[in-house]
């Protein structure tokens, strides 16, 4: 169950995936901001700083390179964005497995492509539930 007013920033190099995220998440009541991975990591990080989304959903491997991993590291190292929950939505199962300990430490959820839409929405809801628990413990 979504809450109106929450903003999700989706980052991907595939316009069809961005369109899917826009349609799916908007229908659930979220404000959706789309960011194409054709830009630099710095540009996308600046967008995340500017938008201050409640959640980032991003790809991991772009054009065979680990650009998503670089962006994730930048998000986690930046004091203005490190608090933003991240879901990595990727088809790069091998890379996810290799970096699973790092992803766990960074508190990053992973959804492997191809994904079931209901599963993605369950993970989004889980992120909101965990964010609520974290704010109650602060």
Describe each PLM feature range.
Residues 15-35:
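Two-component/phosphorelay signaling modules centered on CheY-like receiver
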Residues 11-12, 35, 56:
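Conserved sequence signature across two-component system core domains
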Residues 1-9, 13-16, 42, 116-138:
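Non-catalytic signal-transmission and effector/linker regions of two-component phosphorelay proteins
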Residues 41, 59-74:
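Conserved phosphotransfer microenvironments
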Residues 14-21, 63-64, 95:
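Short acidic/polar segment at the start of the alpha1 helix of CheY-like receiver
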Residues 66-70, 90-112, 118, 122:
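Alpha4 helix (beta4-alpha4-beta5 surface) of REC/receiver domains from two-component response regulators
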Residues 52-54, 80-85:
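His-Asp phosphorelay/catalytic-motif detector in bacterial-type signaling
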Residues 50-62:
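Active-site beta3 strand of CheY-like receiver
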């Amino acid at each position: 169950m979504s809450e109106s007013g929450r903003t999700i920033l989706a980052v991907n190099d595939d316009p069809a995936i961005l369109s899917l995220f826009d349609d799916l998440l908007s229908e659930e009541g979220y404000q959706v901001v789309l960011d194409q991975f054709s830009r630099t990591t710095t540009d996308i990080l600046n967008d995340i700083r500017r938008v201050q989304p409640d959640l980032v959903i991003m790809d991991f491997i772009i054009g065979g390179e680990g650009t998503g991993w670089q962006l994730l590291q930048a998000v986690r190292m930046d004091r203005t964005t490190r608090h933003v929950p991240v879901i990595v939505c990727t088809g790069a199962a091998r890379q996810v497995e290799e970096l699973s300990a790092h992803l766990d430490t960074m508190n990053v959820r992973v959804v492997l492509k191809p994904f079931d839409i209901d599963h993605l929405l369950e993970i989004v809801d889980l992120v909101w539930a965990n964010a609520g628990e974290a704010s109650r413990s602060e």
